[in-house]
């Protein structure tokens, strides 16, 4: 069913083999300068929709890997999430941007977009806009592909943001995403 591939790759295989593979980015790989953006949560009822982005270059990417930063779906306890968040904030020169939309605000905003993918694209573009304000010379942004690539490109254009954008499935394998 839905999510089976991710369950096998990120939960079952690591439990059986004791290893967690990150196919897109291997340990020690040089991290080119980029923004990584992704979202978590539902927003509509159970809790906030959080869209976050971080700037990573080779040094910051190495620091994030050393902390054990990974796809949040692989983090099994809230104490580990808090520990990672604290560690990320302590990385020298870390630059990040968050958009957190609680259920009430989510339900107010959603009718403006009439479509979850357009809403997510607005959130991703807002995070990229915040990051560009902090690191104007960053050459590219990497986002998990959650819709037709044009949806996020249109949201960036609406904010007059001209940055090279790469969208791909399983972008969470990149330490910045």
Question: Which residues make up each language-model segment?
Answer:
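Acidic (Asp/Glu) carboxylate-rich active-site/surface patches
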Residues: 1-35, 39-177
């Amino acid at each position: 069913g839905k999510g089976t591939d991710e369950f096998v790759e990120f939960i079952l295989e690591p439990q059986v083999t004791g290893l967690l593979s990150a196919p897109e980015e291997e340990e020690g790989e040089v991290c080119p300068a980029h923004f990584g953006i992704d979202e978590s949560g539902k927003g509509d009822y159970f809790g906030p929709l959080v869209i976050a982005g971080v700037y990573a270059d080779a040094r910051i990417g190495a620091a994030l890997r050393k902390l054990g930063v990974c796809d949040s779906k692989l983090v099994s306890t809230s104490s580990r999430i808090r520990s990672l968040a604290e560690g990320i904030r302590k990385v020298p020169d870390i630059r990040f941007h968050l958009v957190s939309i609680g259920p009430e605000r989510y339900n107010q905003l959603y009718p403006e977009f009439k479509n979850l993918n357009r809403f997510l694209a607005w959130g991703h573009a807002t995070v990229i806009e915040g990051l560009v304000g902090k690191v104007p010379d960053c050459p590219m942004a990497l986002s998990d592909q959650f819709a037709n690539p044009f949806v996020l490109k249109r949201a960036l254009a609406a904010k007059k943001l001209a940055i090279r954008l790469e969208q791909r499935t399983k972008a969470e394998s990149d330490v910045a995403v």
